[in-house]
Amino acid sequence: MKRTHTCGELTINNIDQEVILQGWVKKIRKLGAMVFIDLKDRYGITQLVVDQQHIDLINNVKNEYVIEIKGNVVKRKSINKELVTGDIEVIVKELFIINKSELTPFVLENDVNVNEDTRLTYRYLDLRRPVMQNNLIIRAKINHIIRNFLTDSNFLEVETPYFAKSTPEGARDFLVPSRLNKNKFYALPQSPQLFKQLLMISGIDRYYQIVRCFRDEDLRIDRQPEFTQLDLEMSFATSEDVMQISESLIKKILKEVKNFEIKEPLLRLSYKDAIDLYGSDKPDLRYDLKIHTLNDIFKNTNIKFLNNPDLFIRAICIDQLLSKKQLEDLNQQAKQFHFNSIAFIKFENNNWSGSLASQLTENEKELLIKEFDIKNKATIVLNIGKYEQISQLMGAIRISLAKMFNLETKDDFKLLWVVDFPLFEFSEQENRYVAAHHPFTSPKEECLTDFDTNKKDALTCAYDLVMNGFEIGGGSQRITNPEIQQRMFDAVELTTQQVETNFGWFMNAYKYGAPYHAGIAWGLDRISMIVTDSNSIRDVIAFPKNSLGIDMMSNAPDLVSEKQLEELNIKIVK
């Protein structure tokens, strides 16, 4: 039989109709001579009623069995307002077991007390939980909004290759050996960057793609070895054009998915100010907690360890009194950043306490009250160090304080652009300057004359879209002048041979007329994670890898046969 309705469809308007439903048994309850079954599918839950006359139909039915029923829709005596179908129930006349189920390794409820690797091993069961299905539904809705919006904005969806040439700049590539071309390898692309720029030279004008990308890097809660991007590029466009259309798109997504309004234009914060105020280039603006530099306050201090004009005293003040346990947690965090501990000062009802309180002068106390606008109570957390290191520490402490005091408001979305990034960063490992983004990012106009000789101060036309402390998008104006591109290659010390080997095929296209262009890539996994309030991007991906990059369900990656290796001309060295 073919089902007439889903399990989330029947309402008061269907009373007295004969229906056929199919789904999984969520729960069986006996009440006197009656048996109640909650039947579930992706769309919802419908309550079934089996009376004494048909009780034999369910003798062998258990939870998670897949069944089919025929019955009549009646009005429920007790309404369940939590269900769309809560006004009705179905009196079962016929029941057929489609497939049985063994006892599941964990309860398939939203709140489940089981470790993540077990969930990933039985991912097909984990995905039966409503919260997981809702995550995938929201993700699909986001993709649908993106496609409609960009198509309506004259963007063309174009697919780019998954088998590409390895370009060693950046993260590690996943390599794929070629059987037909012995001893040669494809790389799975870290992004479609070069291909989408070639599409601009091809005259496509406006391109987008929802694309899978691959990076062989260490994992964390917001990273996977394979991930999904919204990738787009615009010809005859500047950074402003890309940022404007990005703002309109994210505004539409949040409105349609969360009914949340954002105001345009978004706040813009320079990289320098982001680090100075928040200790991060992706600050969470749902809470304030700005970082202050206190060198002027303590310039004549008697506190010995703060008396070093070559270092920076950085501090955060929160209008709470931290407990001994909370301070110890921050001390442990400081050690992760190679600081011995943090210092703290407490203020309550005009009384000062803490590790530095007894050494404070009256003038320093007055200046601290003024600096942080302290009212009744506060804890100041501070330390001293080189600017970059101490800023990173205080940025991490800022996040920890927000978690301690529940300042990360749910269903609130704070977005901003971080701009004016450094064009280069110095690699201690390679002992040279490398491109902070990628070597095709244009320097800012005011840096064009000396970006390759004044690398320390050179800024880039790059921009990151940040939401609730996560970078959800990053893009830039591209270099389209071959002379400037060559200077960029020289600046990052790529030899003529390296450029020709890695990028010659790409650079050749610039001989034939390239429009100026700009673009951006969004991390759709991260956006979905934030919008669904999930703890990890693994909760918004159907079949993710665990924190070690392992597919617990299929046990990939795994060994392959000697024959397969031989065909690829590969020999394992033990």
Curated annotation (Swiss-Prot):
Q: Where in the cell is it found?
A: Cytoplasm
Enumerate the residue ranges of region (Aspartate).
193-196
EC number, as in UniProt = 6.1.1.12
Query: Which reaction(s) are listed as its catalytic activity?
Result: tRNA(Asp) + L-aspartate + ATP = L-aspartyl-tRNA(Asp) + AMP + diphosphate
A cellular component term from Gene Ontology for this protein is:
cytoplasm
Keywords on this record? Answer: Aminoacyl-tRNA synthetase, ATP-binding, Cytoplasm, Ligase, Nucleotide-binding, Protein biosynthesis
UniProt-recorded Gene Ontology molecular function terms: aspartate-tRNA ligase activity; ATP binding; nucleic acid binding
- For whether the record's keyword set contains Nucleotide-binding, the answer is yes
Binding annotation for ATP: 215-217, 224, 471, 523-526
Keyword flag Protease: no
Residues the record lists as binding L-aspartate: 169, 215, 437, 478
What the entry lists under InterPro entries is as follows: Aa-tRNA-synt_II, aa-tRNA-synth_II, aa-tRNA-synth_II/BPL/LPL, Asp-tRNA-ligase_1, Asp-tRNA-ligase_1_N, Asp/Asn-tRNA-synth_IIb, AspRS_core, GAD-like_sf
Subunit structure comment from the entry: Homodimer.
Q: What does this protein do?
A: Catalyzes the attachment of L-aspartate to tRNA(Asp) in a two-step reaction: L-aspartate is first activated by ATP to form Asp-AMP and then transferred to the acceptor end of tRNA(Asp).
Question: What is the official name of this protein in its record?
Answer: Aspartate--tRNA ligase
